[in-house]
Curated annotation (Swiss-Prot):
PANTHER family recorded: ADENYLOSUCCINATE SYNTHETASE
HAMAP family tied to this protein: Adenylosucc_synth
Taxonomic superkingdom: Bacteria
Organism field: Aliarcobacter butzleri (strain RM4018) (Arcobacter butzleri)
Residues binding Mg(2+): 13, 40
GO CC aspect terms: cytoplasm
UniProt cross-references to SMART domains, sorted A to Z: Adenylsucc_synt
Ranges annotated as spanning the membrane: none
Protein name from the UniProt record: Adenylosuccinate synthetase
Enzymatic reactions: IMP + L-aspartate + GTP = N(6)-(1,2-dicarboxyethyl)-AMP + GDP + phosphate + 2 H(+)
GO aspect biological process, one term: 'de novo' AMP biosynthetic process
Magnesium is among the record's keywords: yes
Length: 416
C-alpha cells in the first residue's frame, strides 16, 4: 500500500496538525521526514490543546506507530520534554538512528549569527536548525545512533569544539567541559535509546505489509530551501518529494498528496509576503485566528489568500486535493479578497518569480458570509462561502476536498 502525504503549501502554520490528527485515526503509521523543533503543530481534541514540535501528530492515536525519520534534526532536550506528556510510548515511537542531533550549542550559534546580521537577519526561530543542517551537509554533524556510545560521542564533540574554537570565540559562546557534556549525553542515552532504530527498514516493512501510512510534513512549501522565498526559508526540503529522502522511501511508494492551506495567509519572520494586509482587516484576521507561533509565540503576519502561490505550490507538490483550514476566521467580513495575479515592474504576471520582493498583489473580491462555524456538510455552507471555495479551485486547478470550520476535529467537511 502506498504512503499518503500531508504537506503545507503556504508559509507553514496552515493547520496540518488538525488534519493529520483527524486522518491519523485511520492510519497504522504516521511519519515525520524533515524539520526540527522549529516546526510546531497544534491539535485540538475535545477542547484540549496539544502543541507538538517533533513527535508526529499520530501519537494521539493509541494504535498508530509514529516515526521520526532520518531527515529530521532532533533536539534530545525537546523530544524528552514532549515525550513526558505521554505514557507507554515504547513500541509506538521510533527515531531514526540517522537523524542528526540538534544540541544546545547549535541554538547558541544560530542566535549569535542572527544578532550579528542586525537588520538583515532572516528571522529564524533561533532553535539551531540551520547550523545542524549545515553540519549535516558539510559532513561534520552527529547522529542519533551515536548517542548509544556516549563516551565516544563526547570525545568527538570535544574534538569538534577544539577544531571550531575560533568560531565559538568570535560568537562569544562558551562550551561545556567533558564532565558536563558526558553527563548530558548519558542522560539522553538513558531516556532515548529504547526509541532509536533503523526507521527506513521499519517503514519498508510497513509498506510491504500493506500498512496504512501517513507522511506528515512540517512548515510549508514557501519555506522550502530550494523552492521557497530564498533566503527567507528554512534549511530542509518541505515539499512532498522531501518525504522520500527524509524517510528513505522511493517516489513509487507515494500515494495521495493533500496540500494544506489556510483560507487566508500568514507568515512568521522576515521575507516577502505579497498579500500581507496592514489595515484593520489584517489585524482582525490575526486576532480572530489567534495567529501566534506555536514554537516562538511570535505574532504572525496576516493577509489574504494568495492563489498564485498556492497554484505554484500545488503543482510543485503534485497535490491531489487541498484541505482549506480556518474558513471560520473569515466569518463576518463584508468583502474577502483573493490574489489572482501579481504585478511586477508594471506588468501583470500569473506565476511566482524567483525574487518575490517587488511583486504586488492583484485582487478579486468576493462577498462575505455570516458564519460557517461547526458546519460539517458542504451543502449547508453559506452560498458565498461556496463561491469562495469554487474561486480557489478555479485558480489553483485543484479540488478542495477537506474544509475546516472550527478548531475541533469533528467540525470538518469531507467532500466525496
Amino acid at each position: 500500500m502506498k504512503a499518503d502525504v500531508i504537506v503545507g503549501i503556504q508559509w507553514g502554520d496552515e493547520g496540518k496538525g488538525k488534519i493529520v490528527d483527524m486522518l491519523a485515526q485511520k492510519y497504522d503509521m504516521v511519519c515525520r521526514s524533515q524539520g526540527g523543533h522549529n516546526a510546531g503543530h497544534t491539535i485540538w481534541v475535545d477542547g484540549v490543546r496539544y502543541a507538538l514540535q517533533l513527535i508526529p501528530s499520530g501519537i494521539l492515536n493509541p494504535k498508530a506507530v509514529n516515526v521520526i525519520g532520518n531527515g529530521v534534526v532532533v533536539s534530545p532536550l525537546n523530544i524528552i520534554k514532549e515525550m513526558s506528556q505521554f505514557s507507554s510510548l515504547e513500541g509506538r515511537l521510533f527515531i531514526s538512528d540517522k537523524a542528526h542531533l540538534n544540541l544546545p550549542f547549535h541554538a547558541l550559534i544560530d542566535q549569535a549569527k542572527e544578532r550579528l546580521k542586525g537588520d538583515k537577519a532572516i528571522g529564524t526561530t533561533g532553535k539551531g536548525i540551520g547550523p545542524t543542517y549545515a553540519e549535516k551537509v558539510s559532513r561534520t554533524g552527529f547522529r542519533m545512533g551515536e548517542l548509544l556510545n556516549p563516551i565516544k560521542l563526547c570525545d568527538d564533540i570535544l574534538e569538534y569544539f577544539k577544531q571550531n574554537r575560533s568560531i565559538f570565540d568570535v560568537l562569544d559562546i562558551s562550551t561545556p567541559n567533558k564532565d558536563e557534556l558526558l553527563a548530558e549525553l548519558n542522560e539522553y542515552k538513558e531516556k532515548l535509546s529504547p526509541f532509536i532504530t533503523n526507521t527506513t527498514n521499519l517503514v519498508w516493512k510497513a509498506i510491504d505489509e500493506n500498512k496504512r501510512i501517513l507522511l506528515e510534513g512540517a512548515q510549508g512549501t514557501m519555506l522550502d530551501i530550494d523552492h521557497g522565498t530564498y533566503p527567507y526559508v528554512t534549511s530542509s526540503s518541505t515539499v512532498s518529494a522531501g518525504s522520500c529522502t527524509g524517510l528513505g522511501i522511493n517516489p513509487k511508494d507515494i500515494g495521495v498528496i493533500t496540500g494544506i492551506v489556510k483560507a487566508y495567509c500568514t507568515r512568521v519572520g522576515n521575507g516577502p509576503f505579497p498579500t500581507e494586509d496592514f489595515t484593520e482587516a489584517g489585524k482582525t484576521i490575526g486576532e480572530v485566528g489567534k495567529e501566534f507561533g506555536t514554537v516562538t509565540g511570535r505574532k504572525r503576519r496576516c493577509g489574504w489568500f494568495d492563489a498564485v502561490a498556492v497554484r505554484y505550490a500545488s503543482r510543485l507538490n503534485g497535490c491531489d486535493q487541498l484541505a482549506l483550514m480556518k474558513l471560520d476566521v473569515l466569518d463576518g467580513f463584508s468583502k474577502i479578497k483573493v490574489c489572482v495575479a501579481y504585478e511586477l515592474d508594471g506588468e501583470r504576471i500569473d506565476y511566482m518569480p524567483s525574487d518575490m520582493q517587488n511583486v504586488k498583489p492583484i485582487y478579486e473580491e468576493i462577498d462575505g458570509w455570516d458564519s460557517v462555524v461547526g458546519i460539517q456538510d458542504f451543502d449547508k455552507l453559506p452560498v458565498n462561502a461556496k463561491k469562495y471555495i469554487e474561486k480557489i479551485e478555479e485558480i489553483t486547478s485543484v479540488k478542495v476536498g477537506i474544509i475546516s470550520t472550527s478548531p475541533e476535529r469533528a467540525d470538518t467537511i469531507i467532500r466525496g
